[in-house]
Amino acid sequence: MADDEDDYMSDAFLNQISDVRPGVPMVKRVKEAIKKEALHKEKDIQNRQKSFKEQEKESREAALQSSIGSQNKGFALLQKMGYKAGQGLGKEGAGRVEPVPLNIKTDRGGIGMEEVKKRKADEELQNYRRKVHMKQHLEKKSIEDFRVRKRTEREERQTQGDLRKSQRACEQLDNQKGITVPRDCWYWPEVEKNEESELLEEEIKTEESDEEEELTPLDKLQFLTSYLRGVHYYCIWCGTAYNDEEDLGTNCPGDTAADHDD
């Protein structure tokens, strides 16, 4: 072996290695555990001890609850004037017995801040209730508007359907009586027209629109119902052509769809 090589079995090399016997780390861990336990107990004792403010508060409350002794100069003076311990104030002794309690201010708020805070809290509560009420009102109104809109749409669809049915019945009944031209263009269903007829109809519509406003589907249905009942004694909701006006009035519930719902 060369002289410059390290001898790993020599005493010089082995002495440099730290003592790693199993017992040494164990003793160290035990000491640390004991130290932690002592610190924990010390913290518990500190937590159990009352703070200076708490002790001061308890002392103050105990002093306020205890009666003034006769050794007090002021109390001794009252006794000389005839006052007895436990006696109420006033000539008859029927006044206050207990002293007026002290309300010691402990927070950092200025005088009157409690009233300001209370008033602000009340205002916030009122605003919150007002918002909740407004929200409920809007939701209710929205639901009602939706129902009204749906009902209106349903009624409009029914009116359009009744109008088309009335137009077909009017054309058929007019033809049976030899009537070849409707009383008004919309009394009969619309038919396909050639270009010349469309131009002529546009001119007629323009002249009519100058004279009167355009009728709604409900207006047309009412006019057409009156015509069918008066001329043909016919009711589209009954689906029957009656013999005469008396027969119609006796056996038909009425001249609207609502009259026939029952």
From Swiss-Prot:
Belongs to the GPATCH11 family. The keyword Ribonucleoprotein does not apply. The gene is gpatch11. Keywords: Centromere, Chromosome, Coiled coil, Kinetochore. One of its GO terms (cellular component) is kinetochore. It is found in: Chromosome, Centromere, Kinetochore. Residues 70-116 form the G-patch domain. SMART domains: DUF4187 (SM01173), G_patch (SM00443). Residues 41-62 form a coiled coil. Transmembrane segments: none annotated. GO terms for molecular function: nucleic acid binding. Residues 39-71, 88-169 are annotated as: Disordered. Its main location: nucleus. The keyword Kinase does not apply. This is G patch domain-containing protein 11. Residues 39-61, 114-127, 136-165 have a biased composition (Basic and acidic residues). It comes from Danio rerio.
